[in-house]
Structures are given as structure tokens and as C-alpha cells.
Amino acid sequence: MGRIIGIDLGTTNSCVAILDGDTARVIENAEGDRTTPSIIAYTDDGEILVGQPAKRQSITNPKNTLYAIKRLIGRRYEDEEVQRDIKIMPFDIVRADNGDAWVDVKGRKLAAPQISAEVLKKMKKTAEDFLGEPVTEAVITVPAYFNDAQRQATKDAGRIAGLDVKRIINEPTAAAFAYGVNKVQGERKIAVYDLGGGTFDISIIEIDEMDGEKTFEVLSTNGDTHLGGEDFDNRLINYLVDEFKREQGIDLRKDQLALQRLKDSAEKAKIELSSAQQTEVNLPYITADATGPKHMNIKVTRSKLESLVEDLVKKTIEPLKTALKDAGLSVSQLDDIILVGGQTRMPMVQKAVADFFGKEPRKDVNPDEAVAMGAAIQGAVLAGEKHDVLLLDVTPLSLGIETMGSVMTTLIEKNTTIPTKKSQVFSTADDNQSAVTIHVLQGERKRATDNKSLGQFNLEGIRPAPRGLPQIEVTFDIDADGILHVSAKDKETGKEQNITIQASSGLSDDEIQRMVREAEANAAEDKKFEELVQARNHADALIHATRKQITEAGTALPADEKAKIDAAVKALEDALKSEDKATIEAKQQELMTASQKLMEIAQQQAQQHQHAHQGADAGADTAGGKAHDDVVDAEFEEVKDDKK
């Protein structure tokens, strides 16, 4: 078995790590950074950019630069959260044929897992470059409060990226791994408060140690899969837009270019206000009207930002209360509070957490890297490299089926340790019913329609009988990834129907395979593009060197030879404008052939230059030697100016 890497696929940033010896190690990407912006750009020439290169061009290409795609993964277009995002995102979120929220890029519909796969491919390549070997297996983290559809979609993204996803684990649990494996001894109860770019989770975890083996048992989890740093940014953006409109009378909401510049500046301002009391958003030429260009110059204080996001911070407190109640613990029974996610760097967030728990959160866990490091530890456990760690995670939401009267009947309660299996016997609602529809739901509400529909299937061939007589055994089986498998069996006939819940909004196997093929084709295109760029660079270098040699050769180069070389240079310059590597290389070869006489002259001149230097050096040695002989035994004596 090869190395299993750990990937934190974040809303704002992503990170990849491996276990190096006994310690998890974050791997730097090609740009030298330890985290990679989860930004994907589709350029006019067909190139796909990921990370910083995508972020750098976002201002000039806002409609085709995609970010916070994790907020769409596994979601329906009609979802309330998606409808909110449609109003604020610069790119086009559209309804797919299966009801999913997809993105339209240059007239092409892309699924959220397909887009996220580009980030995963970057993480995969980062690990491969570091390890010097192919990587095919990974542990990928998800928010603890992700539902079944979102977990499935994340696994699909891994498959599209060419990864066998060995395990999906919850982000707070992964962070607890990173903290607990080397930093603590004995039994401890911890709370992991995870406020990232797009999601919020709270998990209460018990770490127990016996005979050198550590057990991480998740006691409860709660959260909000649509609350994070992006929402904080949007509050600040809206404030800046309103202030600018008040001052200048221009509404920037209709200007995508201005909004993209504003998004970058708002994010920077928010980060600066974590360490400073005041900052300035200064954007020259943000827009223009009939009177000329307009500039934005707005001061923002920390207290102003805090007033804008106060309700968002408060929104994280209720899940804390629920998680503690579900775990059967009081605040005083917790030993440590761990902060995860970039948004927890905000002093207001840290104070809210400290006030609620009555103790300061620990500062020795890197909020941006802990999740990937924990995933790497889990990867090492699965690969058999690490044996002294056991993880007992939970399902975040209750699972059940719709029964008579549109009621959700729960089979597996939320916060049940996984993997788990539960069966229950149901019957028919009507006389002589020959088939039943099993409608699988996830959520905490009693009314079936108020919960998340995960999918449905039919069990047919039931022997006609009075209602209530047939016995249909429904079994729910949740695997270690938190993904649900359901079966229904007629106990009389033995007929059985099994499915892995493929949410009605999920990708089919055929669609995933198509996207895998497209990803592979893109990889081939990327390689082709890289080779074209290399050919162009070599050609540019050759043109530069040739022109320099022509200048140095001067009159030694016959006019007809110079004309021949000039023509070859022109032909190569024309070839550089094409997209054809073979043409560039052919014209490059022609220039080298045409420049043979020039190279001979350059060689002769170099030899003459060398001989001249050698002669000068020999003369200097002789003179130097004589001078040296004159002063070997002399005393130091000051030389007067008038004797010079």
C-alpha cells in the first residue's frame, strides 16, 4: 500500500499533509505556501488555474473565477442557502438537470464536485512533487455537520481527481487528532470550535489513553454548514458598498469588476483588524461616472467590523449549548477548548468562545493546518503505519424513513457512534399492497417534508394481504465515512432491495466516470500547455542570444549571412504566436542551422579574447613578481604626498 495523504478541502483554503515519522507534516505547494486558496479559474485560452494563480487574475476575470464552491457541494439549486449565494456570487449558479446547484462557465455546466476536484488535483500533485512518487489514496475531511449528500459529493470529487478516498472524516475530529496524538497524556474532554471559510462545527470529544493506545471518541457534534468567514466578508463588503453609495451616489453592486476588487480588499481589511484597531480600504479608480474616475477611501475600525458581524458570532453559540447537552456534559467538565478555522483568529470570536466556556482556548494548535494534519494521521492509521490510535466518530444527524401521515420515523439517532447498523420492521398502509416505497430522510424534525430527503427506492413483489400484515424489515447501515446503505426485505417472501443512498441530487456513476475522463484529458492538455510554454521560453532565449551575438560580431559577419539569420529570427517570432509546439521547434532548428557561421565567428572572437587576456595576465605576473621581490624584506614606510 502506498502513502495515504490527508487533505483538508476547505471553503477558502485547502491544505495537504502526510505523516513524516511520528509527526504530521504539512506540504508546501509549488508557490511555496502551506495552504492553497480554494479558487479555480477558467481562462480564455482553456487553461484551468488553481490557488494563487487563480486568485491573482480574479479581478479581471470575475465571472469565470470560482470560489467557496464547497458551499454548493451536495446541495439542491432550490436550497435556501444556494438562493442566498446566487445573489452575491459573481459567477452563474444554475440548476442542473438532476436539480443540483451547478455553475455555468463559458456556457458549460460544471458540477460542484467536478470543480472541487481541481483543488484536490492540486493537493495530489503537491504531495507527489514532495514524495517523488504517485499518490492515489487520500483521507479527505468534511464539516462534521455535512449531511449524506454532501459527504457523497466530496467522495465523488476525490474520484474525479483520481484519488481513492479511503476515509471521509469530520474536520473537528481531525483537529482533535492533530492536538491529541502528541500534545496530551491521559484522559481529557475537549471542545473543538471550528469556524472556517464557509462552515461552522462544534464537536465534544473524549480522549482516553490506555496501555499506550489513544481512543478519540466523539460524544456529540453540531453546527451550521452555511456559516463562515465568507459571511463575515460579505457583511464588510455590503457596508463598504453602502458607504460608497452614500458618499458618491454610485451603487457598486452592479459592477462585477469593482465587487471583485472590493472582495479582496475586504478580506485583507478583516484580517488586518485582528491585530490592528483600524485599517483603511483604499481603492483608486474603483469606478467612474460622467464627472470622471471615483476612488474609494474608507476607514474601518475593529469595533465597526464587530458591530457588522455580531449576530454571526452569536449564531455559533446555540450549537455549543446543544452539543454540550447532547454529550451530557457541563462547561466545567471540559479540559481544553481548541480553535480551528481561519475565522477563529478574530478577537471577537475568541472572546465569545472564552466567555461561553469560562476558559481561554488553547493557542498551540494552528487553525489553518490542524485539520489536514489530523487527516494525515488517520491516513497513516489506515495504511498500517500507526497503530496506537482509535477513532470513534458519530453521525451528525438522525436518519429514518417516511411513514404513514408524512411522519419521519427515526432508525438511527444523531450522535450515534459509527459505523453502526439498525433494523426495524414496518408494514403496509393499504390492503393488498404489492409494493412499498422506502423514502430515506435525514434530520431532526417530525414532519417528513421538513427534513433532508436522501433518496427513495421501491420494494416490489409483496404478497397481497390485509394492511398491517406483511412484515418489511428496513435496515440502515452507516459506514465509517458516515455514508448510509439501506436495505428493505419482505420477511415472508425473502425479497430484498439494497441501495447505497445516492441522493436524488447526486452524481450518477456514468457522470462521475465522464468527469474522471475529462479530468484526465485536462491533465493531458495541461502537460501539452506546459511543453508549449517551455518551447516558447527556449525559443525566446535563442532569439535573445542570437541578436546579442550579431551585435558582438559586428562587421565580421557577412551581410548575406546576417540577412539569412534575420529571416530565420523573424520566422521563429511568427511561430511563437502560434499554439503549435512542433512549428516552434522546427523554426528554432532552422535558426540554429542559419546561425552556424555566426556561431563560428563568436567562437573565434571568444578564443581571441581569451588569448589577449592570457597575454595580459602573463605580463602582469612578471611585473607583479618584480614588484613583489622589491618589497619582501622592506620595513613599512609612510610615503609623503610630495614624493608621489
UniProtKB/Swiss-Prot annotation:
Residues 602-625 have a biased composition (Low complexity). InterPro entries: ATPase_NBD, Chaperone_DnaK, Heat_shock_70_CS, HSP70_C_sf, HSP70_peptide-bd_sf, Hsp_70_fam. It comes from Tolumonas auensis (strain DSM 9187 / NBRC 110442 / TA 4). One of its GO terms (molecular function) is unfolded protein binding. Keywords: ATP-binding, Chaperone, Nucleotide-binding, Phosphoprotein, Stress response. CDD domains: ASKHA_NBD_HSP70_DnaK-like. Induction: By stress conditions e.g. heat shock. Residues 601-644 are annotated as: Disordered. The modification Phosphothreonine is found at T199. This is Chaperone protein DnaK. Residues 632-644 have a biased composition (Acidic residues). The keyword Ribonucleoprotein does not apply. Acts as a chaperone. Belongs to the heat shock protein 70 family. PROSITE patterns: HSP70_1, HSP70_2, HSP70_3. It comes from the Bacteria. It holds the Pfam family HSP70.
